[in-house]
Regions:
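Conserved acidic residues
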Residues: 169, 256-257
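Conserved SAM-binding motif I beta-strand of class I
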Residues: 194-200
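Conserved Class I S-adenosyl-L-methionine-dependent methyltransferase catalytic core
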Residues: 35-166
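Membrane-proximal basic amphipathic "stem/tether" segments
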Residues: 1-32, 75, 104
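Conserved class I S-adenosyl-L-methionine
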Residues: 167-177
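S-adenosyl-L-methionine
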Residues: 211-252
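A short SAM/SAH-binding and catalytic strip from SAM-dependent methyltransferases
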Residues: 258-268
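Conserved SAM-binding loop of SAM-dependent methyltransferases across substrates and taxa
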Residues: 178-190
Length: 268
């Protein structure tokens, strides 16, 4: 995990116009919690039950509410460490864990027996969709599939009724969650070579590292671009993924074939 990248994003965010480029109250709370969780646990298994990194923008489920708390909440919740109370709380976690296991079992049954899901699996390529400890998944023909990726495939399939993704070379996404949509598109549409991915801090950090896991040096992060006055693609056909925080939208100097936003605009 590039802690220098995370720190640079956090520090530079303090210098920008807060009304334009910082999150509102809801996401500000979430972002502060995510930063704490990143520094405490890193990105390992951030899609799993034990991490609070990706709650609200990734596909993890909540097992322990303490992972969702900020500073004041963590102080108040410290009373749960009192031996007798901790025993009760541990029992509650065991019950919650049992409910989650049953939920995931039923979810798996629904997905792997759904004809639409089977058709999507035949139509699209799903590679390494359950990395970083994904629990929202099912197994079909000995292959694990993320339900989140299936849902994205369904959305792309619907969009494809009116738009042909095979006809674009460049793609710009705002609010890409943890980068999974871009991963899915690049897996299925080899014609897409140039990506701009913009999200808030620290979500953009998570998405950057997620995409770097798959695409390595093809990913350009904020450490590469923070001093660049005009951000644009290299003039070649090599894969290029430029990951930027909100304030760098002013530095973009690039024509884009397709702009995409799935959900974040409705939250603003």
């Amino acid at each position: 995990m590039k802690i220098t990248l995370l720190n640079k994003l956090i520090n530079d965010q303090k210098k920008v116009d807060k009304k334009l480029y910082l999150s509102g109250p809801y996401w500000n709370y979430k972002n502060s919690k995510t930063i704490f969780q990143l520094r405490k646990k890193g990105l390992k298994n951030f899609r799993g039950l034990e991490s609070g990194v990706g709650t609200s923008f990734a596909d993890n489920l909540i097992l322990d509410f303490r992972n969702e708390l900020n500073f004041k909440g963590r102080i108040v919740s410290s009373f749960l460490n009192i031996p007798y109370i901790n025993k009760i709380f541990s029992g509650q976690l065991a019950v919650t864990s049992s409910h989650i296991k049953n939920y995931l079992k039923n979810l798996s049954i629904v997905y792997k027996n759904n004809e639409k899901v089977k058709n999507l699996i035949k139509k699209y390529v799903f590679e390494k969709t359950t990395e970083f400890g994904c629990t929202n998944k099912f197994t079909l023909n000995n292959i694990d599939y993320s339900t989140h990726y299936i849902n994205m495939a369904y959305r792309i399939d619907i969009l494809s009724n009116t738009f042909n993704f095979k006809n674009i070379r460049s793609f710009f996404e705002i609010g890409g969650g943890f980068g999974s949509n871009i991963h899915f598109l690049l897996t299925n549409f080899q014609n897409i070579k140039k990506i701009i991915y913009l999200d808030t801090v620290p979500n953009i950090f998570v998405g950057t590292e997620y995409l770097r896991y798959f695409y390595g040096d093809s990913v350009k992060d904020y450490l590469n671009t923070n001093k660049t006055k005009k951000i644009s693609f290299d003039d070649n056909d090599k894969l290029e993924i430029i990951c930027i925080p909100p304030w760098q939208i002013e530095n973009l100097d690039q024509i884009i074939d397709h702009f995409h936003n799935a959900a974040s605009f409705v939250e603003m």
